């Protein structure tokens, strides 16, 4: 097999993809043909499988998230399946980095300022607050909460934009005040 870089092909991704695509005659880009369509879905599945390996190697960190596509990236339609698969996997599988240096599904994480995370960081704090259904009582941590998501090192960075595109729930000081003033705490 021979490798030809598709110099005019723009994926909008911040990582390289290699597959046996049918190229244009000039070999400068990938041809719009039905033969290439299955490769994009296979690359999406491979990318998600790779995230599990990256996590297991200890490399799926907050900083790594800056490499992944975020909602503000200009990604051509045929590459959207890769972005969608990554977001779905991060939301549903234990792949999202947490404040406590572990991984959890993004749907089961909360985001807050670092000072609030540090205040309520022990497993006992999370268990104490983890007693109510979040949808019925949004100011409380929920029964299905695994703790705090990792925070972005800089606002409006690729890392921050990626985290904002996940199903992580925001939790703030007002939520905390409502929690400690609630009848449950009496």
Cite the ranges covered by each PLM segment.
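GHKL/Bergerat-fold ATPase module
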Residues: 1-186
């Amino acid at each position: 097999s021979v490798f030809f870089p598709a110099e005019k092909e723009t994926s909008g991704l911040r990582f390289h993809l290699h597959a046996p695509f049918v190229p244009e005659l000039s070999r400068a880009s990938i041809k719009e043909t039905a033969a290439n369509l299955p490769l994009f879905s296979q690359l999406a599945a491979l990318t998600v499988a790779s995230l599990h390996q990256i996590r297991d190697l200890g490399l799926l960190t907050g900083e790594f998230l800056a490499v992944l596509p975020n909602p503000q990236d200009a990604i051509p339609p045929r590459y959207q399946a890769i972005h969608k698969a990554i977001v779905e996997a991060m939301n549903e599988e234990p792949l999202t980095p947490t404040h406590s240096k572990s991984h959890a599904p993004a749907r089961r994480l909360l985001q807050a300022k670092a000072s609030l995370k540090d205040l309520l960081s022990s497993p006992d704090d999370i268990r104490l607050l983890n007693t109510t259904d979040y949808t019925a009582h949004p100011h409380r941590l929920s029964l299905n909460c695994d703790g705090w998501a990792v925070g972005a090192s800089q606002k409006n960075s690729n890392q921050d934009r990626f985290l904002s595109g996940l199903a992580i729930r925001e939790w703030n000081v007002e939520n905390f005040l409502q929690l400690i003033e609630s009848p449950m705490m009496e």
